Amino acid sequence: MRTYQQALQRACEQGGPVLRGTADMYVGMSEVHRERDDLPAATRQLLRSQELGEHTGLPQNRYRWRVAMARIREAEGDLGGALDLLNEAERLYVGDFFPNVRPVPALKARLRVARGELGEALGWARERGLSVADDLSYLREFEHITLARVLLARYTAEGTERPLQEATRLLERLLRAAEEGQRTGSVI
């Protein structure tokens, strides 16, 4: 949070018009607040970003804003509203220099699981060609963790052991890969 606050302070010290990228910093602070389970503060930061206007955001800001708001809606229990925002985000996404390590379709699959729409979540995994035997990479780690969640939901729905065993093996492999890659956030 401190990094965002320092960057905002420096941006404001420049004087003149609001610098491009300022709105993105508010979106980032919103995500930190949401992670801390301070949903009112997270919402305020997003509204501040919106008040600044689209011209103060970088090209991906419209996409990131909707993903951030969707995650707030999900935390509030508004799964339908979250899904609508993710659909908007998916339409607005434009690739850039940064890899998309948390793709919207994976976020939507997680929402589908939460809504009890296991068939749709399994369909997502099939469309993406995901398997518990895949070679693991950081770029697809979020998708594989989502696959594990889908398998656990399948186990809960069907009561058969196979999805549980597959999810366990996949999570063990993901843990080893994260530890070897020193990705503490993934390990947690």
Segments the model singles out, each with a brief description of its role:
Residues 1-188:
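Helix-coil-helix junctions within alpha-helical repeat/solenoid scaffolds
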